[in-house]
Amino acid sequence: MKTTDSLIVLHVAYITSDFASGVSTVVPQYLNEQSEIKDMNIALLNLTNYRPKDAKYPVFHQSCIEKLPEPFCNPSLVIFHEIYRPDHIKLSHWLRRRAIPYIITPHGSLTYVAQEQHHLAKQLLNVFFYNAFIRNADCIHFLSEKEAMSSNGFKHRKASIIPNGVSIPKAKASNLDSRIALFIGRLDIDVKGLDLLIKSLPLIADELRGLGAKIYIYGPDEDGSMAKLELLIADNQVSDIVLLNGPVNGQSKADAFLQSQFYIQLSRTEGFPTSVLEALAYGLPIIVTEGTTWKETANNKGIGIGVESDLEAISNAILTLFNDDEYRCKLANAARKYAIEHFQWKAIAKRQFILYRDIVNGLSN
């Protein structure tokens, strides 16, 4: 039962059916968890016409807050997801005129590497619109310390670090014989470091063929990236090792995790990649770069191998996890345990609620 003095929290996001999008995957999950908190009344103002499957909260598609039904036409707090959405500017102006606080969750879009993409266009947009949007936010909610540290080129009032959570599946990957490594995500070759992955494989191609090892890549095409990846795979003569697939979701996605021995993501920039967290929850060790924000954690917590963006280091890590079953199983057990102890949604949603309450009450430091 929601109380009359519950926080009225409106999330504003661009959610689609593209499950390779971290925002479209993770935001509906934590809104479902937040909807269970008795002292918080939440809704989603979606900037598309899509309604998230199994949503336990109201979903609106009207981009004018004052026309929303009670109580969301007068929210206690608004959460903006991502930065470069034009509707955010209009809505933030409306909020400021009414002294309604707002939080921005950039989802990695303020990092140095992310800002280098379409650099000139972003510089102009920042000067005219988004610097003020960020500066006037009551808090910037980062998903990791790495994201916060690499986003310090922007002035803001306050910052908070709360990671995403993950639903822990009942099943655990335990396939000792599959010899499959996995990547799931947008097929953005540069951002996701897929060029690094493919170019590292010729260094160990003979060993991988001897093991019968495969690299499965799943994800949607990104501006013709599927064809570019196919050419890159052919040029590096690893077409028999790398299997390139379209996007995967639901049970098919679960099966992809369950049939794999480890997960690999070599991103150059991320906020807090959902697929890495999902892999840990299934008990898959991870091979990750600094850009994923997981490199130090992988090494320090014994849940995978953190590597430099170096072809030899990447190939050595891949071969190690394919060859050493005992070591890989040790990492796998630690990976699932780490996800269970630190990233279950219920605990994450409680931390988010405390942040929201403190912002509304003017208590955030």
Give the residues covered by each predicted segment:
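Carbohydrate-associated surface elements
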Residues: 146, 165
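Conserved donor-binding/catalytic core segment of Leloir-type glycosyltransferases
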Residues: 10-11, 141, 173-192, 198-201, ...
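Short hydrophobic beta-strand element within catalytic cores of glycosyltransferases
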Residues: 285-289
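Membrane-proximal helix-turn-helix segments that form the acceptor-binding/catalytic region
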Residues: 97, 122-139
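Glycosyltransferase donor-sugar binding loop
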Residues: 46-49, 184, 213-228, 246
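Conserved acidic donor-binding segment of nucleotide-sugar-dependent glycosyltransferases
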Residues: 300, 304-312, 320-326
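Aromatic "clamp/platform" in nucleotide-sugar-dependent glycosyltransferases that forms part
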Residues: 268
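Short alpha-helical donor nucleotide-sugar binding micro-motif in glycosyltransferases
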Residues: 72, 134, 247-248, 255-260
